[in-house]
Amino acid sequence: MQWTKSEQLYEEALRHIVGGVNSPSRSYKAVGGGAPVVMERAQGAYFWDVDGNKYIDYLAAYGPIITGHAHPHITAAIQRAAETGVLYGTPTPHEITFAKMLKEAIPSLEKVRFVNSGTEAVMTTIRVARAYTGRSKIVKFAGCYHGHSDLVLVAAGSGPSTLGTPDSAGVPQSIAHEVITVPYNDVESFREAMNVWGEHVAAVLVEPIVGNFGIVLPKPGFLEAVNDIAHEAGALVIYDEVITAFRFMYGGAQNLLGIEPDMTAMGKIIGGGLPIGAYGGRQDIMEQVAPLGPAYQAGTMAGNPASMLAGIACLEVLKQEGVYEHLDRLGAMLEEGIMTHARQCGLPVTINRLKGALTVFFTEEKVENYEQAQRSDGELFAKFFKLMLKQGVNLAPSKYEAWFITLAHTEDDIAYTIDAVGRAFRQL
């Protein structure tokens, strides 16, 4: 493949856009650098770049595009919004319809509020938890990304009982000291942190199924222990379901796992490809939010008709029979094919998969936390990424990210991808 136009456009982008990209994950820094491929259009399971190259897409915009690109039902909803006005600044019937759909799908959502991104949703749940409890600190888990607000850009201290340190320039140490970070899937470290800081903790923020250092499932009993220990200390439990809501079933990961948090943050899939976030939870907690309560949250674009109509349409597609069975069947096919080639080539590969989402780690170690994910071979992944790209398979340019199968992928797409993996593995 030739990427002449992509390279030229990237050079131009560098002159006008910081780093040439509008989100650092879109750069190829984590896979050795170079110009990222510039895409021109997308349809179904495929991308076409500015040089005319075609790709099978497993990026799915980092998760939102579960139906495939330009799904006709969602496209029609967006066209309807364009024709009737995309932004009112007033209440609309669509936000009521959509809120009811979310509540019906995820029973823990007694009340809901729409925002514009997953970052906003998480940020606001923390503010509401602080208002409800009168406390300031939060506990989060190492490697779990919760957006780019200051309070969640915090790395772990030297141990589970120590306070965090800033994970980005521009985050004050004073804010980092409001955060305790502990290893995911480690009940004892969490218990130790809560024994020390529990009376000051407003909320525990957790991905019920991790999506941000790869797909990682909770160990049996982990989430139950988080709920019990947090509630014993008087803290709330917030599930970050920005990636997981409607990813594995019609509803949240909490439905699949059979355990409910106090509040939930959502985004990505629920917007049907348009910008969106939502948060919700117990009524007594949510009534802390203005105009009913003292916790302020607002947004010019929040609940806009375009995002509401796209989200409604997306959920209508996902509610159809056989949707998640299709994703699971293709996911199992892809996992089996990759592992067969890995064994044949003698490569250290571990796959974490749930239904249509999987992560390929270049390690023989079982990956259950961030430290184990970090030990996977990033150099090997970088070579693999570029070999797959040359064969027309588009993956996320990071060893930590998931591959997302969409409703538009076919068995032929999976078969081609498996063959491409085999060719790539033989060159590693």
Curated annotation (Swiss-Prot):
What InterPro entries is this protein classified in? 4pyrrol_synth_GluAld_NH2Trfase (IPR004639), Aminotrans_3 (IPR005814), Aminotrans_3_PPA_site (IPR049704), PyrdxlP-dep_Trfase (IPR015424), PyrdxlP-dep_Trfase_major (IPR015421), PyrdxlP-dep_Trfase_small (IPR015422)
Catalytic class of the enzyme:
isomerase
Q: Which UniProt keywords apply?
A: Cytoplasm, Isomerase, Porphyrin biosynthesis, Pyridoxal phosphate
UniProt modified residues of type N6-(pyridoxal phosphate)lysine: K268
Q: Superkingdom of this entry's organism?
A: Bacteria
What GO MF terms are annotated? glutamate-1-semialdehyde 2,1-aminomutase activity; pyridoxal phosphate binding; transaminase activity
- Read off the SUPFAM superfamilies from this record: PLP-dependent transferases
SUBUNIT field: Homodimer.
- The entry's protein name is Glutamate-1-semialdehyde 2,1-aminomutase 1
Species of origin reads Geobacillus thermodenitrificans (strain NG80-2)
Q: What is the lineage of its organism?
A: Bacteria, Bacillati, Bacillota, Bacilli, Bacillales
